[in-house]
């Protein structure tokens, strides 16, 4: 399996297009044409993680957090530059799966909920998928070759189906004027043409490409086409809602997930003895969604990186919070390993996958 093949597989199951616009996901360092010798999953790509990959003979690291986030201005032999230089020197490919793994139905938040032993887990804060229905009008004799070109360039595809067009016949009319150079008709004379309206669906990211292809392959000098926006609720969403088996107190639940996640500290906001049943989870830094979680029926909102003023606001408004630290996302190492092994087995790909044993939590606890 080459890196390009791995990227295609990852994009199929955890689409990079579902990442936030500000994020930096995908192949950050590497060569798509090289063969994968093994995959190491990690929360962060630190120097220790790179050394671990080298020791195992694996040339591919898939990290959750992007090593390259802001603009890199230099690659010196220290700090992040040292890590990047070592990756390049040892021909190690680095792939980041960040917010696209966060919003995935099988991603980080699902992994956290399962690690906490919760049930009835479902995605919340669903994204809106944007599609376009494309309409254009073309002379009857040109329909076949035109559709062929669109299909060859990846348009008019629906899941496992290609060449997905709808046609309806009609009669078009126009009058070329001035410096027009018409394919059909004469200057200053109204022309009537038997035309076919062709309709097909595209994803939002294909819009500019579709416009380019229509202009390139349409026989008319100035083709007419429409893009009609359609929105649908996506399967992807930031966070999950889940439940405990039996109602328990806020303090007992906080202690329980601290033990199950095996993390050194947990903080919570709210009355210790308050009973909870439904839990909303956004791993990493999810503050900003706590009030929405309550509106969706959550008794407590679980996330990390909670700041003092956000916690105080929540307390004043009676919103229960549990801070499980950002590093709690480490569960994705084993979680992603399991997903990869399942995908590889399905595709009959024989490739070693291991979860990094390196603890990349920058904090020390006393």
From Swiss-Prot:
SUPFAM superfamilies: NIF3 (NGG1p interacting factor 3)-like. GO terms for cellular component: cytoplasm. It comes from the Bacteria. Keywords: Metal-binding, Zinc. Zn(2+) 1 binds at residues 64, 102, 329. Gene3D superfamilies: 3.30.70.120, NIF3 (NGG1p interacting factor 3)-like. It holds the Pfam family DUF34_NIF3. Zn(2+) 2 binds at residues 65, 326, 329. InterPro entries: DUF34/NIF3, DUF34/NIF3_bac, DUF34/NIF3_sf, N-reg_PII/ATP_PRibTrfase_C. GO terms for molecular function: metal ion binding. Homohexamer. Belongs to the GTP cyclohydrolase I type 2/NIF3 family. This is GTP cyclohydrolase 1 type 2 homolog.
């Amino acid at each position: 399996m080459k890196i390009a093949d791995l990227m295609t597989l990852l994009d199929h199951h955890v689409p990079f297009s579902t990442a936030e616009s500000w994020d930096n996901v995908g192949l950050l360092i590497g060569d798509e044409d090289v063969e994968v010798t093994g995959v190491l999953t990690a929360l962060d790509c630190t120097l220790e993680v790179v050394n671990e990959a080298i020791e195992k003979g694996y040339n591919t690291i898939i990290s959750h957090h992007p090593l390259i986030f802001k603009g890199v201005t230099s690659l010196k032999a220290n700090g992040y530059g040292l890590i990047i230089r070592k990756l390049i020197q040892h021909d190690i490919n680095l792939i980041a799966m960040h917010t696209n793994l966060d919003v995935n139905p099988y991603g980080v938040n699902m992994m956290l909920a399962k690690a906490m032993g919760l049930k009835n887990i479902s995605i919340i804060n669903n994204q809106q998928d944007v599609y376009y229905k494309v309409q254009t009008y073309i002379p009857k004799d040109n329909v076949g070759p035109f559709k062929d070109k669109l299909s060859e360039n990846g348009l008019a595809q629906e899941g496992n189906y290609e060449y997905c067009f709808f046609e309806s016949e009609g009669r078009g009319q126009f009058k070329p004027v001035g410096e027009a150079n018409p394919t059909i008709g004469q200057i200053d004379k109204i022309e009537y043409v038997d035309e076919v309206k062709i309709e097909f669906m595209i994803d939002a990211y294909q819009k500019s490409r579709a416009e380019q292809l229509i202009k390139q392959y349409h026989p008319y000098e100035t083709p007419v086409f429409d893009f009609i926006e359609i929105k649908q609720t996506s399967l992807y969403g930031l966070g999950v809602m889940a439940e405990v088996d039996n109602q328990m107190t806020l303090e007992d639940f906080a202690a329980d997930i601290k033990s199950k996640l095996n993390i050194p500290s947990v903080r919570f906001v709210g009355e210790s003895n308050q009973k909870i049943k439904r839990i909303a989870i956004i791993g990493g830094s999810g503050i900003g969604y706590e009030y929405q979680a309550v509106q969706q029926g959550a008794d407590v909102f679980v996330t990390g990186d909670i700041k003092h003023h956000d916690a105080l606001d929540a307390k004043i408004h009676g919103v229960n919070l549990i801070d499980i630290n950002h590093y709690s996302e480490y569960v994705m190492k084993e979680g992603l390993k399991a997903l990869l092994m399942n995908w590889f087995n399905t595709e009959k790909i024989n490739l070693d996958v291991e979860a990094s044993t390196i603890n990349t939590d920058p904090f020390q606890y006393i």
